[in-house]
Amino acid sequence: MGSRIFSPRRLYSALSELKTETVIPKNPNKRTRDGSFRKFKRVAPAIGDSMHPFYSPNIMERAILCASEIKPELLDGQPIVPAVIKQLKTLEPALVNTRWQPQSTQGLNDWLEPFRKMRRKSSPLKLIENHEIDNVIRPSRIDSGRIPELRKFALMFEKEDAGILSASTIGSLIDRLAADQEKAVFSEEVFLYILQHYCKSSQGIASVVDSITEFLHKDIDDLKTAETLLAHVLMALRRNSIPLTPRATSAILKLIDSVSTRFHRPFCVVDFSPAVVQMTTEFYVDSGFLKESKVLFTDMVNKERCPSAQLVEKYLGLIESVCGISTSDNDFLKKFVYISNFRPIFQTTMTPRITEFLVSYCRHFDEILSLLVLVDHSKVKKQIWDLVLPQMIRRVSLLTKDSAKNCCHLTVLYQKASRFYGMPLSTKVNKAFIIQYAVNGNFAMVARLLSIIDSNAFPSFYASVLAAYDQSSAFSMEVPSSGAALKNKHQFMTSMIIPHYTEISFVGRQLALKHADTEELLEQVLKAEIAIKGRGGKSLLPQVSLKAQDCKSNYIITEAEKCLQH
């Protein structure tokens, strides 16, 4: 990325080489040298400087942006866009959470042009097929019947005695074979034979790899040969399900470093074929090396090749295990670093598991919509919708603290799901939407969706709706408290809860009693509890009496105490 001239503006310090610093804005009212005061212009980062791998504003978002006369912005101007900028004083690159919030509409069309080009030019990568490794993997050219000394290797690997199975003993046997002019054996052919026939444990792999490393500096003088040997080492791990012990991992890392040194390469793996790069990337991911894995993913993207979906899933899982659960914008920033150039990969391969990971990266509803565009181009979009929709519903429900906005987003998602599946949606999906509408206090939508499904079949589900509504305080949700909202909740209680009250569990009845906030509802609860007690069930009459005292309802207090005395 070339150097850009920055106009005076507010500048944030953040990550330098992936290390976050405290975000401190410059004082906009600080006195300048000439005695005047100035404010720094708000500058939106260029599209090329942003690192978001799946968000791209659609036509409607771009139109609204250009039509905004005041405060044009994308993603509601939230500071959630990972971008690389140059610091004003040092010109050092810094990774920060920025806003797509230009100062004015002037020049917006040019600013948006990279988005249009990205959409026009976006094309899937060529997937790395499993059979491509066959161009590197080959059988050893050794005729075992002509070389009886190979039996010594068989005995050595069968015993796996640490004193016998070592790089030095393997190397000495290979030296003797290579020195025999009648046999005319090359060391790499012996290594290939051993890897293909005898290496079935981590100790065996470590010893052979250490021996290969020694021979790099005295006998192996071709990079393609080194690539073939590394590919066979990794194939032996996969084929024999050999666990990666610290010793085996260390030996393979040392081999890769030695190949780079031997052939004067900064990182030899990037010079290998895409199939070997993919195998090596899988080794790094399985070993927990996140930065090295990112380098190799970048190499595959630069070569316009796409790794397997299973490897992408493994890598995203490694990011989660290393970075942990994101609780702040800086936590998200670290994660975005490791998938910054993954857009071509996501355009090529999108699975339910990949989508699950990416949903957790979304902090704005427009990111969800962009993700759904990628899902629509997937060959397995039906499986993605089936498996990920419940998680997506929950994520959308909690994107903001504004319950009205969340409900609008839920409705848009409901409409998209309806267009995909057709109406009516399944009971499972409807129940997922109902729960999240309840979390946001929208009992009008709760009642509407309950009317679609068989309302008599799920009396126990109604208590779950009340429990979900109680969660709004845990999420610091700003639930509506208007007269209409309270009326909708009261209607839900009278039409859904009270008629099925006796069918609800004891815990569910406790929730119903908690939300019986009028004398009319409390009286209905009292009658139901008296009936339950009459049948010998466990009643809530003492709690009803206490609730009635709070409501100052003398009639209910009297009836509850009369029933308790009997």
Swiss-Prot record:
Keywords: Mitochondrion, Transit peptide, Translation regulation. It is found in: Mitochondrion. Signal peptide: none annotated. The keyword Transit peptide applies. One of its GO terms (cellular component) is mitochondrion. Pfam families: AEP1. The keyword DNA-binding does not apply. Residues 1-13 form a transit peptide. One of its GO terms (molecular function) is translation regulator activity. Required for translation of the mitochondrial OLI1 transcript encoding subunit 9 of mitochondrial ATP synthase. Belongs to the AEP1 family. This is ATPase expression protein 1, mitochondrial.
